[in-house]
Every structure is written in C-alpha cells, then in structure tokens.
C-alpha cells in the first residue's frame, strides 16, 4: 500500500490505546515492539479480518524513504524522508555490551549553536511521537534486531527536545512502557540546550530519564558567542532548574561541553566550570569539535582537550572525553546536516509507510 496521510499513525498510541480488545492490543504491541513487524500481514496470530481492518485505517511507518550510510567504525547514519518530503536523521552505534541509537526530535534546530551543522539548517518543524519512535524501529529492522535489543536511547540528534516536549514525552512514555520497548529510564538520555521551563516540566513528569545539558561554557558572555539563543536563559536560571531536576529525580546530570579553540578551552574556564558544578551530582562530557563544511569555529587540539580534562579531574569533577563515532559519514556529534556522504553507496530500505 502506498504511503498515505489518510492513514492514522499507530505508533502514536500507547499499548492500552491500540485498536481491538484487551488481549488483541497486547498481541499488536508485541508484534510492533518485540518482533518489529513492518506490515500488518506479518501479525499472523491476529484474525485476517482484523489485520485487513488495521491496514485500512492505520500506518506502520512514518517514512517514504530510508537511506543508510555505514561508517568504518561500525556506526550507521540514517537519513529519513518523512511523508511530507522533509528529512531528518538518526545514528546507530553498536558497542560490545550495548546497542545505542541517537534519535532526532525535529527537522533542523532553532538553537543555532555555532559548532553544530544542524543549527546552520535552521528550524523545519517538530517531529511527531510516531516519527521519533519509528527511527528506532526502522533502525532495528535494518540491523536485523528486535526493537527491544536496542537498550540505549539518546535524544541528541536534530532538534531541541524541550521545545517539542509534548511529542517527546509521548514517545518516551512508549519507550518506557513494559508492553512496548520496555526501556529502563536510566537508559534514556534527553539532551537540551537549557530550557528552564522544560526542565521543570520534565522533572514533574517523573519519568526518571537522564538529563544532559549542552552547556559549552561556564559563563554567559562566552556561552552567548557559542549559542546565539543563550541570551534568553542565563546560566544561573538554567542551573537552578537543573538542580531541581537532580533533587527530584536523584539522577546524575551530564554536562556536554564542546571544546573550541580560543573560545571556551582556557584552563580558567575549566576552573569556573568546576565551581559552577560544585555540590551537584554531575559528570562532564568533553566533546572534541567535529568539523563540517562552512563551520565558523575551530576545534581545540587534542593536547588542549586532554589538558582541560585533567584540570577538571584535578578539581574533583568526574570527566570523560567523548571521541565521536561516524565522523567519516557526517554522523558525529554536531555533524547532522542532511548531507549525503560520498563516495559511500546509499542503502535504501524496503518500502515506506503502509508496508
């Protein structure tokens, strides 16, 4: 069946909201989230009449085209064409002890961070909960996995999740639902540039997911140079919200910090960062800048990255360096820009919506 906006997105529904009687809903949820069915005809323990009725009313996929770009390090970037023709991206990252996906929450991003290729695209639109979830389901299908074999989700792709909070919360609830993806809350990380109102709301929802703050500078003056929209929310206001989130959820907060040469990589800034985080259960993720065409900034050399990390550790701040994966296909942190990597060959996936 061809993709059609006339069909309703079944991935928008919690398991208890799925069509059919109680036990039929459980069967449909099992097919969607445990077996990864991509067509209603695959749901062979449902009556044929029900399968046909589902196919007439609902769609299983939110994409008209999916393309995959494998990296030499084993990660894979996915480019999704949505039903309205707009595009977004996600990344699959297999590790020895876990399989992780980095999902997008928007087409483009309104934050405009200077180091981020997505920000240079500007804002397209919010993704629906179904479009967020289907990134994971489609990646699992492509990798020959059950969706439940992907046990780590980071909402760190395109977009600012807290500016699409309604749809993001719906998607996360389905990820955590025992009859859906059954993810542990501590295996879901939501990354934000720092929207205080959204952080408070996330705390009140009490989902228990991990929070990552894209801080990138310990002072407002420097941060405004890196994040043009940072003038709306002073660091003190953001930190007050973050401390509330930590107090409410008891979850350690991660602080993302992309190091830019001569901008935010001075050792005095490391000391100021340590002072800012004092008394908070926090972990700093230092991110070496991943270059992209037209970027207005330059990354800190490796020696500078290591020196900044050592200064933070000396001051008692738990710190790690995230050496990004997928750089050769534009899949690394800050590189998602809807670019088609060359000379790698596209890998179209079967079908689209209503397969």
Swiss-Prot record:
Gene: rlmN
One Pfam family cited in the UniProt record for this chain: Radical_SAM
Chain's role: Specifically methylates position 2 of adenine 2503 in 23S rRNA and position 2 of adenine 37 in tRNAs.
Additional detail: Reaction proceeds by a ping-pong mechanism involving intermediate methylation of a conserved cysteine residue.
Name of the featured protein: Probable dual-specificity RNA methyltransferase RlmN
Similarity annotation: Belongs to the radical SAM superfamily. RlmN family.
Active site feature: 89, 333
Domain Radical SAM core stretches: 95-322
């Amino acid at each position: 069946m061809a993709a059609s906006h006339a069909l309703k997105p079944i991935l928008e529904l919690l398991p208890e909201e799925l069509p059919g009687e109680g036990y039929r809903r459980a069967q449909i949820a099992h097919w969607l989230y445990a077996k990864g069915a991509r067509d209603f005809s695959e749901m062979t323990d449902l009556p044929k009449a029900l399968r046909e009725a589902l196919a007439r009313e609902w769609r299983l996929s939110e994409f008209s085209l999916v393309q995959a770009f494998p990296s030499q390090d084993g990660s894979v970037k996915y480019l999704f064409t949505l039903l309205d023709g707009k595009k977004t991206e996600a990344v699959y990252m297999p590790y020895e002890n876990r399989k992780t996906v980095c999902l997008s929450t928007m087409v483009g991003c309104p934050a405009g961070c200077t180091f981020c290729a997505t920000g240079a695209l500007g804002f397209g639109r919010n993704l629906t909960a179904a479009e967020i979830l289907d990134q994971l389901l489609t990646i699992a299908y492509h990798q020959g996995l059950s969706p439940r074999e992907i046990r780590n989700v980071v909402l760190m792709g395109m977009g600012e999740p807290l500016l699409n909070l309604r749809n993001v919360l719906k998607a996360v609830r389905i990820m955590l639902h025992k009859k859906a993806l059954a993810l542990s809350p501590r295996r879901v990380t939501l990354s934000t540039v720092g929207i205080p109102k959204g952080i408070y709301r996330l705390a009140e929802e009490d989902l228990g997911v991990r929070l990552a703050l894209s801080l990138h500078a310990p002072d407002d003056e420097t941060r405004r140079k890196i994040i043009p929209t940072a003038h709306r929310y002073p660091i003190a206001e953001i930190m007050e919200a973050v401390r509330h989130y930590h107090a409410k959820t008891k979850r350690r907060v991660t602080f993302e910090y992309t190091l830019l040469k001569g901008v935010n990589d001075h050792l005095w800034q490391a000391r100021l960062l340590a002072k800012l985080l004092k008394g908070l259960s926090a972990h700093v993720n230092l991110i070496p800048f991943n270059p992209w065409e037209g970027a207005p900034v330059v990354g800190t050399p490796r020696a500078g990255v290591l020196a900044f990390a050592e200064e933070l550790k000396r001051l008692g701040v738990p710190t790690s360096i995230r050496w990004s994966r997928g750089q050769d296909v534009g899949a690394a942190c800050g590189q998602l820009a809807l670019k088609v990597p060359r000379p790698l060959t596209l890998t179209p996936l079967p079908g689209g919506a209503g397969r």
